[in-house]
Curated annotation (Swiss-Prot):
Pathway where this protein functions: Amine and polyamine biosynthesis; S-adenosylmethioninamine biosynthesis; S-adenosylmethioninamine from S-adenosyl-L-methionine: step 1/1
Gene that specifies this protein: SPE2
Organism: Saccharomyces cerevisiae (strain ATCC 204508 / S288c)
NCBIfam families: SAM_DCase
Protein name in the entry: S-adenosylmethionine decarboxylase proenzyme
Mod. after translation: Is synthesized initially as an inactive proenzyme. Formation of the active enzyme involves a self-maturation process in which the active site pyruvoyl group is generated from an internal serine residue via an autocatalytic post-translational modification. Two non-identical subunits are generated from the proenzyme in this reaction, and the pyruvate is formed at the N-terminus of the alpha chain, which is derived from the carboxyl end of the proenzyme.
InterPro entries: AdoMetDC-like, S-AdoMet_decarboxylase_euk, S-AdoMet_deCO2ase_core, S-AdoMet_deCO2ase_CS
Enzyme active site: 29, 32, 88, 102, 287, 301
PANTHER family: S-ADENOSYLMETHIONINE DECARBOXYLASE (PTHR11570), S-ADENOSYLMETHIONINE DECARBOXYLASE PROENZYME (PTHR11570:SF0)
Single GO MF descriptor: adenosylmethionine decarboxylase activity
Task performed by this protein: Catalyzes the decarboxylation of S-adenosylmethionine, a key step in the biosynthetic pathway for spermidine and spermine. It is essential for normal growth, sporulation, and maintenance of ds-RNA virus.
One GO BP: spermine biosynthetic process
């Protein structure tokens, strides 16, 4: 699938002033904090008339200020709202949200305000009578170890402090340190037990939810250079009243690196909707949100600075089903690695179905990556999810 130039003109919201003045010169921390909250198991399970998508833009801006990031632009489909942020992305569905923020953002500081807003504006009551904590259907919070932990806000400098803070809000949370337990090579996960008492609704059909994430460090210099803006790409002035160079250059970076061609689909599925929103930062850096079939997304974020280059990819696309068996997440991974050629990378794959085609294919990935050696390979059974984690390094 590929994007077209019309994707530059169909935003539901865009902050041209922020886009024109945003400067990434002092940015340094690529690895993101990833927060995913399922308030209900499905949109058909929601017990009131309003959903998360009824929350206004001004309220999301208020929430994101607590995180220390801003909204660059937003696109809506029938199923989700995709926000491109000054520091990564936010995806809002009717019943759940995924917030991914890099740099020195304070992701966890939005929790109190977020639950206040859903209670006041949506009449969603998740506070328990005992202890005053919240009990949504499911919560995930994860991040790899930071490149510069001492530069984070105090709450995010230490994983144990983050877990303590999360435990003030949620019951039944469990913490995992996945991979080699050193300062630079592990991945952290916090997940709550599924609240099976949450009403599912008469029409509820369980979704075989899956999420694939690839976190890459030490990118090939030539590959990283494709995400650097030249001196002619000054954003001091807008091209036209409804355009800005950051989004224009983001579109060009997407096309030049073929990041819009990660997923293929069969001939009869060629009419699947595909939306794109990307931004190129000055002097360097790239963020993009892609929406497939109205309800699936994949997002990429790149900090190409020499010495701490980093790129991430995350997707909830059920690739085997969407492609009708023509592609799986191993194919997706190989495409991504070809774009960035990292010296090291880790990947995580969550699925509810252990027999998932991509899950089984990724388990035997070694033979498909002859240029890499395995550092870690771990499988977890997490309540109603299976997690596969693997870390690899290029052969010297």
């Amino acid at each position: 699938m590929t994007v077209t130039i019309k994707e530059l003109t169909n935003h539901n919201y865009i902050d041209h002033e922020l886009s024109a003045t945003l400067d990434s010169t002092d940015a340094f921390e690529g690895p993101e904090k990833l927060l995913e909250i399922w308030f209900f198991p499905h949109k058909k399970s929601i017990t009131t008339e309003k959903t998360l998508r009824n929350i206004g833009m001004d309220r999301w801006i208020e929430i994101l200020k607590l995180v220390k990031c801003e909204v660059l632009s937003m696109k809506k489909t029938k199923e989700l709202d995709a926000f491109l942020l000054s520091e990564s992305s936010l995806f809002v569905f009717d019943h759940k949200l995924t917030m991914k923020t890099c740099g020195t953002t304070t992701t966890l500081f939005c929790l109190e305000k977020l639950f206040q807003i859903v209670e006041q504006e949506l009449s969603w009551a998740f506070r328990t009578t005992q202890g005053g904590k919240y009990k949504p259907f499911k919560v995930f919070y994860s991040r790899r170890c930071f490149l510069f932990p001492c530069k984070q806000a105090a709450i995010h400098q230490n994983w144990a402090d983050e877990v303590d803070y999360l435990n003030k809000f949620f019951d039944n949370g469990k913490s995992y340190s996945v991979g080699r337990n050193d300062k630079s090579n592990h991945w952290n996960l916090y997940v709550t037990e599924t609240d099976r008492s949450t009403p599912k609704g008469k029409e509820y059909i369980e979704d075989d939810d899956e999420t694939f994430e690839v976190l890459m460090t030490e990118l090939d210099p030539e590959c990283a250079s494709k995400f650097v803006c030249g001196p002619e790409a000054s954003t001091t002035a807008l091209v036209e009243p409804n355009e800005d160079k950051g989004h224009n250059l983001g579109y060009q970076m997407t096309k030049n690196t073929r990041l819009d061609e990660i997923y293929v689909n069969s001939a009869q599925d060629s009419d699947l909707s595909f939306h794109h929103d990307a931004f190129a930062f000055t002097p360097c850096g790239y963020s993009s949100n892609m929406i497939l079939a109205e309800k699936y997304y994949y997002t990429l974020h790149v900090t190409p600075e020499k010495g701490w280059s980093y790129a991430s990819f995350e997707s909830n696309i059920p690739v085997f089903d969407i492609s009708q068996g023509k592609q799986d997440n191993l194919d997706v991974l190989l495409h991504i690695l070809n774009v960035f050629q990292p010296r090291e990378f880790s990947m995580t794959f969550f699925t509810k179905n252990y027999q998932n085609q991509s899950f089984q294919k990724l388990l035997s990935i070694n033979e498909s990556l002859p240029d890499y050696i395995k550092l870690d390979k771990i499988v977890y059974d997490l309540d109603d999810y299976h997690l596969f984690y693997m870390k690899l390094q290029k052969k010297i």
